[in-house]
C-alpha cells in the first residue's frame, strides 16, 4: 500500500546481484514489476528465452504474485531454472517451495551477490542443495555467508529501465545507494538485524563517493538501515564527495540516539545536500518503547527532533499503531502530531516472519493472508471492531496527510512539486491526488474478505526467547563461535 502512494524505489539489491551474475559471464536482464506489467514480463520471457529466472521477494505481501508468476513461467518455459530470493523469501523458504508445487527449483536465503553465480553454475547439478543458503526440495545447504566486501558488485543501474519512475516523497526522481549494510540493534518488531546477524559493514569512502558520483538522478535515497553510526565514516564519504564536487539531495534513515551522538556529522551532510530524514520514533511513551526494545527514552526522541529542526532538515517519523489501541489512543497521537512540524506516519504493528515478535507474540493471528502483511492492515485481534479500527487509523492518517499535503503545506512543498513538474516528473504530484483512493478504511476492511489462495504457516506457540537457529538468517559471529 505504501509503495502505491509515498515511494517507488529502484531495486538496488537486485541490481547488485545482477552485477555479480554479469561479472560471472552471464547475459542478464532485469524487469522491475513495480513499473512493468505481467504482460511485459511474458514478452521478455518469450523474446529473451532465459535459461534461468530469479524473483526477488523482499516484501511478504508479494508472495502470491511471485508464486503465480513462477508457476506461469514453468508452464511457458518448462526447461527454465527458477529461483526465488530476497529478504522476506529468506525467512519462509520451505513454504515457498511448497506453494510452488514444483515450479520453484530453489530458494536462496541471505545475501545474493556471492551465491547466485554459484547457483547458476550448479543449477543442473546434484550439488545444488549443498550450497550455502540454498534450499531445494531435496534438502538445504549450510548457513548462508555474508558478502566480505561491500565495494564489490556495484549496482548494475543500467539494467533498470524507466528510472524516472523512482521517487520518494518530494524527491522526484530519486535513485538509491548503499553506504553501509546491517544493523547492530535488536528491535523486537524488525527483521534487519535477524537477517544480517547484527553485523554492520561499511563500503570504502572512495567507492561510496564514486558510486554516488555515477548516479544521474539529482536525488538519492541512502538505503542504510541506520545511517552514520560511525561518524568518521560519514565524514570521510562527505570529504570524498566534496573533492569530486558531487552535489545531490539526500534522504536517509537513522535512529534518534545516533542523531544526538553525531549531530555535527548530520549538520555537515546538510551542507552536502541532506534534505530529508526518517526517524523511527515508533512510540511516544516509555512503556511501548521498552516493548519494542528501542533502547531509547521518549526524552531522547524529542531531543533528536529538536536537533533535526535546528539543522534545518525535513523529518518524517513513524509511530506503530498497536491493534490494542482504542479511540482515545488514536486521538492522543493526532493531538501530538498536530503540535510538531514533522511528517508523522502510522504503521500497524505486524509480527512478520523473521522478527522476534513472530516467535513471542501471544495473540493469535486473525489472518495468514500474505497480502495483509504490509504494515497497513491489522493481522492481530483489535480491541475495537475491525472496521472501527480502520476508521480511526484512516481518520488519523487523513488529518496528518492534510497537515503535510494540504494548502498550508504549499509554502514548504510547493516549490519541490513545481521543480519536479518542470523536469517532466509527475510521481510526487500524482501522489498528492491518490491518497483518498489508496488510504481508505473500506478498502482496507474489504481486503480481509478477499479469497485466499496462499496462506502462510502459522507461528508455533509463543516462547519467551526464540532459538537463534530459527531467528537468524546470517548467524551472529559470537554465536557461530559458540556452536
Regions found by a protein language model. Give the residues of each.
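Short, electropositive alpha-helical surface patch
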Residues: 237-241, 327-343, 404
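Structural recognition of alpha->loop->beta junctions
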Residues: 95-114, 268-277, 333-347
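Short acidic active-site motifs
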Residues: 39-41, 92, 261-265, 329
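Radical SAM enzyme core and accessory elements
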Residues: 42-45, 51, 103, 139, ...
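Flexible glycine/acidic-rich beta-alpha junction loops that bind and position SAM and/or redox cofactors
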Residues: 4, 92, 185, 232, ...
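Glycine- and acidic-residue-enriched helix-capping/strand-helix junction motifs
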Residues: 2-14
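Radical SAM [4Fe-4S] cluster-binding motif and immediate context
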Residues: 9, 157-319, 323, 335
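Glycine-rich beta-alpha loop elements in corrinoid/cobalamin-binding modules
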Residues: 13, 17-147, 348-350, 354
Amino acid at each position: 500500500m505504501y509503495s502505491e502512494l509515498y515511494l517507488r524505489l529502484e531495486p538496488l539489491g537486485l541490481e547488485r546481484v545482477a552485477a555479480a551474475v554479469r561479472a560471472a559471464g552471464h547475459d542478464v536482464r532485469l524487469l522491475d514489476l513495480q513499473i512493468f506489467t505481467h504482460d511485459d514480463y511474458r514478452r521478455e520471457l518469450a523474446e529473451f528465452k532465459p535459461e534461468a529466472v530469479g524473483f526477488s521477494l523482499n516484501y511478504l505481501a508479494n508472495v502470491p504474485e511471485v508464486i503465480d508468476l513462477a508457476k506461469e513461467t514453468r508452464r511457458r518455459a518448462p526447461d527454465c531454472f527458477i529461483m526465488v530470493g530476497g529478504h522476506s523469501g529468506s525467512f519462509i523458504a520451505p513454504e515457498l517451495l511448497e506453494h510452488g508445487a514444483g515450479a520453484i527449483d530453489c530458494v536462496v536465503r541471505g545475501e545474493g551477490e556471492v551465491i547466485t553465480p554459484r547457483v547458476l553454475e550448479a543449477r543442473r547439478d546434484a550439488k545444488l542443495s549443498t550450497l550455502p543458503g540454498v534450499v531445494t526440495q531435496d534438502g538445504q545447504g549450510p548457513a548462508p555467508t555474508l558478502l566480505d566486501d561491500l565495494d564489490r558488485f556495484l549496482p548494475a543501474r543500467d539494467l533498470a529501465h524507466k528510472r524516472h519512475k523512482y521517487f520518494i516523497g518530494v524527491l522526484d526522481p530519486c535513485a538509491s545507494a548503499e553506504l553501509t549494510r546491517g544493523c547492530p540493534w535488536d528491535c523486537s518488531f524488525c527483521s534487519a538485524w535477524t537477517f544480517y546477524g547484527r553485523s554492520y559493514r561499511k563500503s570504502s569512502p572512495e567507492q561510496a563517493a564514486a558510486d554516488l558520483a555515477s548516479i544521474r538522478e539529482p536525488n538519492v535515497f541512502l538505503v542504510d538501515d541506520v545511517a552514520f553510526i560511525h561518524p568518521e565514516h560519514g565524514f570521510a564519504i562527505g570529504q570524498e564527495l566534496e573533492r569530486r564536487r558531487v552535489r545531490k539531495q539526500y534522504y536517509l534513515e537513522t535512529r534518534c540516539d545516533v542523531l544526538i551522538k553525531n549531530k555535527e556529522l548530520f549538520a555537515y551532510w546538510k551542507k552536502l545536500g541532506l534534505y530529508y530524514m526518517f526517524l523511527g520514533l515508533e512510540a511516544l511513551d516509555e512503556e511501548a518503547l521498552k516493548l519494542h526494545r528501542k533502547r531509547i527514552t521518549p526524552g531522547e526522541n524529542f531531543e533528536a527532533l529538536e536537533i533535526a529542526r535546528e539543522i534545518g532538515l525535513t523529518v518524517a517519523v513513524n509511530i506503530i499503531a498497536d491493534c490494542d489501541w482504542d479511540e482515545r489512543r488514536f486521538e492522543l497521537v493526532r493531538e501530538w502530531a498536530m503540535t510538531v512540524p514533522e511528517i508523522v506516519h502510522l504503521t500497524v504493528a505486524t509480527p512478520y516472519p523473521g522478527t522476534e515478535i513472530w516467535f513471542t507474540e501471544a495473540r493469535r493471528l486473525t489472518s495468514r493472508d500474505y497480502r495483509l502483511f504490509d504494515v497497513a492492515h491489522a493481522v492481530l485481534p483489535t480491541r475495537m471492531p475491525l472496521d472501527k479500527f480502520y476508521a480511526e487509523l484512516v481518520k488519523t492518517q487523513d488529518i496528518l496527510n492534510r497537515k503535510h499535503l494540504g494548502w498550508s503545506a504549499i509554502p514548504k512543498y510547493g516549490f519541490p512539486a513545481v521543480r519536479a513538474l518542470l523536469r517532466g516528473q509527475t510521481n510526487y504530484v500524482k501522489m498528492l491526488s491518490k491518497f483518498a483512493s489508496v488510504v481508505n478504511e473500506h478498502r482496507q476492511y474489504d481486503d480481509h474478505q478477499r479469497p485466499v489462495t496462499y496462506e502462510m504457516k502459522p507461528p508455533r506457540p509463543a516462547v519467551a526467547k526464540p532459538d537463534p537457529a530459527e531467528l537468524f538468517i546470517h548467524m551472529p559471529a559470537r554465536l557461530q563461535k559458540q556452536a
